[in-house]
């Protein structure tokens, strides 16, 4: 982390990987596998990224016992002449990485949504609910490597979209607290009343940007 936060500050792109069996990869992307995604991203980076930038592949913490991409990353570095410009990491703190990276490339991981909350440029390569004009980079991956330095997500649009998702798609509760009334099952806290004004504004703003 020290190297990423100092010598490589604002000089690296982050590629947070999803679990190999993630249905979002299987059904909502054009990639045959996470490994296929890695190969295509590295190929694009090698051909189009500025020579002083580094690509950092971050393994999903829940997939480490099942898949090891270290050998693949090593082979890709040799194939594309990316010695010292292609790294593979595991346990680094994501919010800290967001603050030091140039941008993130994801398939459709929720990590992309988290990166947007930090005002970081994000390029999605699959179908994602947050892949909206004004939030994510809408041009090609090949163009992202150069344009990420000037592209920024719209903070007002993100705030509205986040509020809309929380209001319409989330339930306040916990799987880890005791059950309500002593009965079986997870504890579901009472939801707060919806803020219909915020929801309507959020929906309208999202729709406006999506149609531009």
Go through the PLM ranges and name each one.
Residues 29-31, 71-74, 122, 139-141:
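Short secondary-structure boundary/capping segments
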């Amino acid at each position: 982390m020290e190297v990423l936060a100092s010598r490589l500050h604002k000089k690296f792109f982050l590629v947070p990987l999803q679990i190999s069996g993630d249905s979002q990869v299987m059904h909502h992307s054009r990639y045959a596998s996470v490994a296929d995604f890695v190969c295509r991203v590295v190929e694009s980076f090698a051909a189009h990224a500025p020579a002083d930038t580094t690509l950092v592949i971050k393994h999903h913490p829940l997939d480490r016992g099942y898949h090891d991409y270290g050998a693949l990353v090593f082979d890709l570095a040799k194939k594309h002449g990316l010695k010292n410009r292609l790294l593979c990491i595991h346990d680094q703190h994501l919010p800290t990485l967001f603050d030091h990276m140039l941008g993130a490339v994801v398939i459709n991981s929720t990590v992309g949504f988290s990166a947007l909350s930090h005002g970081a440029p994000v390029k999605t390569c699959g179908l994602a609910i947050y892949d909206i004009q004004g939030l994510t980079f809408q041009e090609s991956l090949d163009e992202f490597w150069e344009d990420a330095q000037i592209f920024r997500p719209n903070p007002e649009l993100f705030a509205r979209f986040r509020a809309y998702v929380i209001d319409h798609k989330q339930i306040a509760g916990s799987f880890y607290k005791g059950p309500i009334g002593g009965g079986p099952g997870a504890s579901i806290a009472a939801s707060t009343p919806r803020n219909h004004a915020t929801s309507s504004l959020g929906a309208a703003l999202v729709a406006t940007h999506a149609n531009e």
